[in-house]
Amino acid sequence: MSLWPEMATGEFALKTVNAGGVRTRYLEAGRRDAPAVVFIHGTGGHLETFNRNVFEHAEHFRVLALDMVGHGFSSKPDHPYEIRHYVRHLDDFLDAVGADRAHLHGESLGGWIAAQYAIDHPARVDRLVLNTAGGLNTDEAVMKRVYDVTMNAVRNASLETVRKRLEWLVHDPREIPDDLVELRHAIYTQPGFERAMENILCLQFMGVRMRNVLTEESLGRIRSKSLVIWTDHDPTAPLATGERFVKAIPDARLAVLEGCAHWPQWEAKERFNKLHIDFLLGR
């Protein structure tokens, strides 16, 4: 298994753009005049989170996937990254790539960002997909686990510790190919990345988290038709959390992808791609 066969048979471009002063690495595929869909990764992640989804979506959409501020190979300004900073970066990115309006897909932290963006900028969001999203969970044990396994992969970076971090995302560890481990190891061993990860992980501290959390009241202001995707083995929050999102968002429905953990777009690509594309197309 490899990270790259998924990307070998279609056309795409890896680019960088200045998004509000943040040098932002992103992937683009599909027709520029097609409706845009933006894929937003989770904590410590990068755009390759969505390698298994790009070309199926590019048949219908202008696909954009980016390394969020502080993440991947994008710029890493030295300050703690709270949700408002990610929301501002996403808004600047949409401006920079000329996408006035887009579907948003957010995985984990990306779902937290996407939900808050839909609350703050409703006119710019078409349909919204929250994939095992953060933002409601305030379980200190989970927060500590995220912090510990992530910082260990950075402070003691090796192929083994990085693999352990990635395997935490999936139900079957065989889903993690060696070259994905090598890519993330390259990201985690960039000069200064330990400091960047400390800034990323500020949301795992309760005081910071509580001033950023989503609430039923704030989710009730989302006007986009929404799909909440959950799994039966998610390590960050139970299915009940997905149900809370659906109950709070006025026009939302729930889909559960079984046999998956925290990366259903990767673990169950065929089921995910069909579900996701059908939803975005209104089928």
Predicted regions and their residues:
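Conserved HGGG/HGGXW glycine-rich cap/lid loop of the alpha/beta-hydrolase fold
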Residues: N18, V22-F73
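Conserved alpha/beta-hydrolase catalytic His-Asp/Glu region
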Residues: T24, A141, N156-R221
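Conserved acidic catalytic loop of the alpha/beta-hydrolase fold
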Residues: R84-A102
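Gly/Ala-rich beta-loop-alpha elbow adjacent to hydrolase catalytic centers
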Residues: G106, G110, A114
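Flexible "cap/lid" loop of the alpha/beta hydrolase fold
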Residues: A115-I119, D126-V162
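Acidic catalytic loop of the alpha/beta-hydrolase fold
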Residues: R209, H233-A237
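Short beta-strand/loop motif that positions the catalytic acidic residue
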Residues: I222, V228-W230
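Catalytic active-site module of serine/aspartate enzymes centered on a nucleophile-bearing elbow/loop
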Residues: D251-R283
